[in-house]
Amino acid sequence: MPRGQKSKLRAREKRRQARAKNAQEKEASPGPFYGCPHQASPVASMPTSPNMPMGEQSTFSHSYTSTSDQNLDEKSSDDSEDTEDWCKDPINHKVVLLVQFLMEKYQKKEVITKADMLKYVIKTSKNHFNEILKRASEHMELAFGIDLKEVDPNRHCYALFNKLEHTFDGVMGEEKMPSSGLLMIVLGVIFMNDNCVSETEIWNVLSMMGVYANRKHFIYGDPKKVITEDMVQLKYLEYQQVPNSNPPSFEFTWGPRACAEISKMKILEFWAKIHDTTPDSFPTLYEAALKDEEERAQARAVARAHTAAMASPYSRATVCSSSHTNI
């Protein structure tokens, strides 16, 4: 074979090998959006509150204690390593990719189909599709308060729904994923701390989930702004300076809108589900949630009675007016 032809064949073979290598890397590595984010730690790592009764605290999968800044840095480093190890598992990695894929579809208001999930995310892991989808759905529900539901079984089309009765799209804008999950976590921490918690403790808890005050989050955007400004303006949270604190420190309580729209039982059910248990596994918190349910029922009864009392004179006046007209 002529030397020139051999050179062409060698060059062609090198190009073929390079293309094959690039294809393998593309399959193994996610695109710029579907990377394994630092924040995508397992939902099971969500911590308990330091002020939760000890008997109840031990029921949760991971205990939590207040730490110094140095310990927080060490904890952040450990969590980062745990996250990397967790993401190295092929199935876990696909779960993270699918969660991000679903969120991008949500933001673009595009139809979610099984075919697209298989084509763009699952790829060679088709045999594990059901497991990956189930775990991704659980992650979105527990971490973000979002339900994934199949809305067209024939075409295998899915849609995302906010678990709360009232959506929180206004918190981050219509183009972002609702942050109801973040709100429920913050409300839960407040509930577990006798209905008032320091800002420091809130960030200690959220940092264990990969949510930091000074770091952009791939779902929540600017978490500090969402919690200390947006949710406060929407009256889901109250954020105020601790009296006589020097340097100034701040604390959170439930806002009037949260008190009106979200029951403590709903929050406790949310946290219990995170830790794969039931609300009555935490007797003290469960008792407080039951008391809240009773107070809500009484308030509704009083409101109904008041409405009926206001309507009664109007009804009598209407009857009298009709009688005079007939005469």
UniProtKB/Swiss-Prot annotation:
- The biased composition feature labelled Polar residues covers 46-70
Where is composition skewed (Basic residues) in this entry?
Answer: 1-19
Name all MAGE domain ranges: 91-289
Q: Where in the cell is it found?
A: Cytoplasm
A Pfam family assignment: MAGE
Quick one: where's region Disordered? 1-85
Q: Does the keyword Repeat apply?
A: no
What are the alphabetically sorted keywords of the record?
Cytoplasm, Tumor antigen, Ubl conjugation pathway
Q: Which domain of life is it from?
A: Eukaryota
- Gene Ontology annotations for the cellular component aspect, listed alphabetically: cytoplasm
The main place the protein resides is: cytoplasm
Q: In which tissues is it expressed?
A: Expressed in testis, stomach, large intestine, small intestine, spleen, lymph node, bone marrow lymphocytes and blood T-lymphocytes. Not detected in brain, heart, lung, liver or kidney (at protein level).
Does the record's keyword annotation contain Cytoplasm? yes
What this chain does, per the entry, is described as: May enhance ubiquitin ligase activity of RING-type zinc finger-containing E3 ubiquitin-protein ligases. Proposed to act through recruitment and/or stabilization of the Ubl-conjugating enzyme (E2) at the E3:substrate complex.
Q: How does it assemble?
A: Interacts with LNX1.
Return the protein name. Melanoma-associated antigen B18
Q: What is the lineage of its organism?
A: Eukaryota, Metazoa, Chordata, Craniata, Vertebrata
Q: Which gene encodes it?
A: Mageb18
